[in-house]
């Protein structure tokens, strides 16, 4: 089973993608994880990508396509792709690769939330500067404000988590996703999921659909 999952900043798509990975034994491919790993390595490419993210801009398609397709070549089948494609140019690159290798996408899941909810979820996020633990000032606050429960490190807000940057990211996402949504609708594999509510509530909107697809595919 091959899945695409996308959603605006703060939609919880990565959390749901990991649940899907565990339940169906898929390989998890996260564009965000791949990009962050490159940035953390402080490579020239990583430093270049960091500049785009700090401004709330999208990383150029040529860079993202190279990173993702390279990962996909090592996986081949039974994957869930988190956060890719996000532009029409990325769709073209992905479709060309899939066509050349005889791979089909079973479903494209879109987890939708409003801009207000996106800002609320993202702007409250805090990251430990030492160990990388993630907190939220509203949903998962540390015991001592500004300090990590695990290692005592200072909690910081990532530059791209600032409210004004989140709003910009949301607007860019929605603008770029419109033609992508239409593309997958025409293919008959697009499914829109309400991303508001708890993690479990959203999961129960996704699980029955994927159980059906998985069981149907297994009987082929």
UniProtKB/Swiss-Prot annotation:
Annotated positions binding ATP: 10-15, 125, 134-135, 197
PROSITE patterns reported in the protein's UniProt record: ADENYLATE_KINASE (PS00113)
GO molecular function, one term: zinc ion binding
Source organism superkingdom: Archaea
GO cellular component: cytoplasm
Chain residues that bind Zn(2+): 128, 131, 148, 151
Coiled-coil boundaries: none
Subcellular location: Cytoplasm
Enzyme class: transferase
Subunit structure: Monomer.
Domain note: Consists of three domains, a large central CORE domain and two small peripheral domains, NMPbind and LID, which undergo movements during catalysis. The LID domain closes over the site of phosphoryl transfer upon ATP binding. Assembling and dissambling the active center during each catalytic cycle provides an effective means to prevent ATP hydrolysis. Some bacteria have evolved a zinc-coordinating structure that stabilizes the LID domain.
Protein name: Adenylate kinase
């Amino acid at each position: 089973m091959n899945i695409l999952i996308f959603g605006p900043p703060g939609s919880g798509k990565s959390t749901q993608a990991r649940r899907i990975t565990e339940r169906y034994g898929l390989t998890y491919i996260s564009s965000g994880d791949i990009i962050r790993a490159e940035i953390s390595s402080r490579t020239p490419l990583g430093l270049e990508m960091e500049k785009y993210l700090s401004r709330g801009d999208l990383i150029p398609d040529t860079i993202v396509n190279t990173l993702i397709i390279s990962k996909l070549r090592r996986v081949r089948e039974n994957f869930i792709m988190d956060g890719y494609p996000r532009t029409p140019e990325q769709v073209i690159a992905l479709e060309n690769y899939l066509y050349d290798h005889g791979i089909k996408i079973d479903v494209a899941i879109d987890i939708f939330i409003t801009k207000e909810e996106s800002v609320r979820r993202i702007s409250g996020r805090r990251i430990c500067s030492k160990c990388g633990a993630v907190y939220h000032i509203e949903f998962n606050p540390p015991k001592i404000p500004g300090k990590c429960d695990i290692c005592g490190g200072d909690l910081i807000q990532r530059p791209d988590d600032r409210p004004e940057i989140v709003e910009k990211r949301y607007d860019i996402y929605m603008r770029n996703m419109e033609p992508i949504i239409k593309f997958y609708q025409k293919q008959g594999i697009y499914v829109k999921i309400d991303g508001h509510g708890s993690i479990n509530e959203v999961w129960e909107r996704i699980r029955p659909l994927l159980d059906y697809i998985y069981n149907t595919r297994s009987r082929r």
